[in-house]
A protein has these predicted regions:
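An N-terminal boundary/leader segment
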Residues: 1-53
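Alpha-helical scaffold segments in soluble metabolic enzymes
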Residues: 10, 28, 57, 106, ...
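Secretory-pathway/luminal and periplasmic proteins that interact with or process carbohydrate-rich
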Residues: 34-39, 60, 83-88
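Short, polar/charged, Gly/Pro-enriched helix-capping and turn/loop motifs at alpha-helix termini
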Residues: 40-43, 65, 69, 125
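Long amphipathic alpha-helix in the N-terminal Rossmann-like dinucleotide-binding domain
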Residues: 51-56, 115-116
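Immediate post-signal peptide segment of exported/extracytoplasmic ligand-binding proteins
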Residues: 58-74
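Short glycine/serine-rich loop/turn segments
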Residues: 72-152
Length: 152
């Protein structure tokens, strides 16, 4: 089974068991995004270098036994209306295209505490007012399971 087909819990178990690494998981996700992003428009912000560095650091902590949370090493996407310290958070609006929060939202903190590693920020309707992404300033997102369906 491909790493991309595993649930977050399954992937965390594989990483903890040494069957794969946080770096391999992040690389697989970023490669998939590279292949499909032009079609699906799922992301507003991705910093590949930062994501790979974070995965490397997570893997080092896993191997040292200091990162043991239930999502240790698992790549996660963060919705673009959740503040992420030092990472542009637009809420899918051009009004906030240069907003860089000085803090992490509590949901982001909890994911970090669980050991998750951020891939990037996902597209959404502007200010989360809808479910189709038709109002996103960054384009309409298509459902990756069925492009004829809305993602939300």
């Amino acid at each position: 089974m491909s790493l991309l087909e595993l649930t977050a819990v399954e992937l965390a178990k594989e990483i903890k068991a040494g069957k794969t690494t946080a770096v391999e998981a992040m690389k697989a996700v970023l490669e998939q995004i590279e292949k499909t992003e032009e079609t699906y428009h799922c992301y507003i912000t991705i910093d590949k270098e930062k994501a790979m560095q974070a995965a490397k650091e997570a893997q080092e902590k896993i191997e040292a036994g200091t990162l043991t949370g239930p999502l240790a090493g698992v790549p996660v996407a963060i919705k673009d209306n959740l503040c992420t310290k030092g990472v542009v958070t637009t809420c899918a609006s051009k009004i906030l295209e240069n907003f860089v929060p000085q803090y992490d939202a509590e949901a982001v903190v909890k994911l970090q505490e669980a050991g998750a590693v951020m891939i990037g920020k996902t597209n959404m309707d502007e200010f989360a007012m809808g479910s189709t992404t038709e109002t996103s300033a960054y384009g309409v997102t298509k459902n990756p399971r069925n492009p004829e369906h809305v993602p939300g």
